[in-house]
Design a protein with these regions (language model features):
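Active-site metal-binding core of divalent-cation-utilizing nuclease and nuclease-like domains
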Residues: 64-109
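C-terminal tail/extension regions appended to the core domain(s) of diverse proteins
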Residues: 2-30, 34-35, 50-58, 142-229
Length: 229
């Protein structure tokens, strides 16, 4: 079982060589760093999930974390409103083919039951929140009882998301956008303190990943996973 200290050590070691690795990579500098930070956040979130379940005394064999596509079927109410008769009839005759596969970064299953979904981002701004909410909304049309989370390394949402207070009041813009997706009830957790700055990226202006905040993330998930132990 990976410990919180080991998560922090991994974060430190990767971020401190990220700039050098990006310059040596055959990939575009910016693209390499975006991918690296995204994968790092997915790793951290995955380990936090495991620690939370372990702390609750859950059997690791009962826990499955994946990102398999969720099949979202076409809505019949939409099909019946299609004005072009031939198009409408064609879709109805082939209705089993009409679906959309969608996923977020972490789908948490306990005993095969889908109970929680977590989107992982190196950072989030409000333009990205709209896409995240749409994804969760579509998933919840099929799996209405899951809990939805956004785990981000840094915040660019304004408000106090990046201040890491015990009670997060959020931002005017983010709450306004989320109010149009009432079925989602998105929980946003930020790991690094300080609003993201485009001119001060964390691979050159290092931000520490603090033990207490990772522990808070663990406790947050424990609160939602406890009923499934």
């Amino acid at each position: 079982m990976t410990s919180i200290n080991e998560i922090i050590q991994t974060y430190d070691s990767i971020l401190k060589v990220a700039d050098k690795d990006a310059k040596e990579s055959k990939r575009a500098y910016g693209g390499f760093l975006r991918s690296l930070k995204g994968k790092l956040q997915e790793y951290i979130t995955g380990e936090i999930i495991k620690i939370a379940w372990h702390n609750l005394g859950g059997d690791e064999k009962r826990l499955d974390v994946n990102s398999k596509k969720i099949r979202v079927p076409i809505r019949l109410s939409y099909v019946h409103k299609i004005r072009e008769t031939k198009v409408r009839e064609y879709i109805l005759q082939n209705i089993e083919k009409y679906h959309y596969g969608i996923s977020v970064d972490k789908h948490i299953h306990i005993d095969g039951k889908f109970v929680m979904a977590i989107e992982c981002k190196a950072f989030t701004e409000n333009a990205m929140i709209k896409r995240i909410l749409v994804d969760f909304h579509l998933i919840k049309t099929v799996c209405p009882n899951i809990s939805c989370f956004l785990f981000q390394l840094e915040s660019q949402l304004t408000g106090d998301y990046s201040a890491l207070p015990k009670t997060v009041f959020g931002s005017v813009s983010t709450h306004s956008i989320m109010s149009y997706f009432e079925d989602v009830d998105l929980h946003i957790f930020t790991l690094l303190e300080g609003e993201r700055s485009i001119t001060k990226p964390i691979h050159t202006f290092f931000k520490p990943l603090k033990y207490d905040n990772v522990e808070r993330a663990v406790k947050l998930l424990e609160g939602y996973l406890n009923e499934f132990v």
